[in-house]
């Protein structure tokens, strides 16, 4: 529920910031989800990354205003979410974005902007052309399209295309510090983990987040 997520964000966002990492918060068809995320980031002094879905223009810019009010220093959009089955045919609609549309969004927020869901070198170059500060190489856990390659398979080619020109992050099955090391060796500048931190914050709150981060750093 949105209330449950709001409670999680209240614990997750400051706990991650205190552990020296940044929490990416989510978005959904229920507008309260993004509102709760923005509120949690605002309460943590802007130390979190609000991640918005590729909605229609009016919905998107209203959500961007909410995120701007939080004081967030970095924004993100999971561009591949346009293909999620649960967003199909909904109001508000979500869909793909052109380079020009992304450029307008990035110029509007006036802070570094990450585009999540990039799986090709061509997509990475388009993100760079749009003015993105970074990308997240991600297949959305395989939930957008069947048969997509693993992120580790496509990461080297993407790194060859844009390494040094923008920040390259990657997610997908990263569970240990050794996995982090592999991602860095394949060309990433950093990684994202979702499920382990969800488990940590539910099971141990801020202490769970701290211990997991400490464990990953030690393994790395």
Stretches found by the model and what they are:
Residues 1-9:
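Single conserved hydrophobic/aromatic residue that forms the stacking wall/gate
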Residues 7, 14-18:
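PLP-dependent amino-acid enzyme catalytic core
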Residues 17-23, 43-48, 106-112, 162-166:
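Short, surface-exposed connector motifs at secondary-structure boundaries
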Residues 18-56:
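A gly/proline- and charged-residue-enriched helix-loop-helix capping module
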Residues 174:
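Short donor-sugar binding/catalytic loops of nucleotide-sugar-dependent glycosyltransferases
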Residues 198-209, 220:
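Short beta-alpha connecting loops at secondary-structure transitions
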């Amino acid at each position: 529920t949105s209330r449950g997520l709001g409670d999680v964000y209240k614990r997750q966002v400051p706990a991650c910031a205190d552990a020296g990492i940044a929490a990416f918060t989510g978005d959904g068809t229920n507008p309260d989800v993004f509102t709760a995320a923005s509120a949690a980031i605002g309460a943590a002094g802007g130390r979190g990354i609000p991640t918005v879905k590729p909605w229609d223009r009016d919905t998107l810019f209203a959500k961007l205003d909410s995120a701007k009010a939080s004081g967030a220093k970095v924004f993100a959009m999971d561009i591949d979410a346009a293909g999620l089955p649960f967003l199909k045919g909904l109001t508000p609609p979500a869909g793909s974005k052109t380079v020009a549309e992304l450029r307008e969004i990035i110029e509007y927020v006036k802070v570094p902007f990450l585009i999540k869901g990039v799986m090709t070198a061509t997509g990475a170059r388009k993100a760079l052309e749009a003015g993105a500060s970074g990308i997240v190489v991600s297949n959305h856990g395989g939930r957008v399209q069947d048969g997509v390659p693993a992120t580790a398979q496509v990461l080297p080619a993407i790194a060859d295309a844009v390494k040094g020109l923008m920040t390259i992050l990657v997610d997908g099955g990263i569970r240990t510090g050794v996995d982090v090391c592999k991602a860095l060796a394949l060309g990433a500048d950093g990684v994202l983990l979702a499920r382990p931190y969800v488990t940590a914050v539910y099971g141990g709150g801020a202490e769970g987040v701290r211990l997991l981060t400490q464990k990953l750093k030690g393994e790395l």
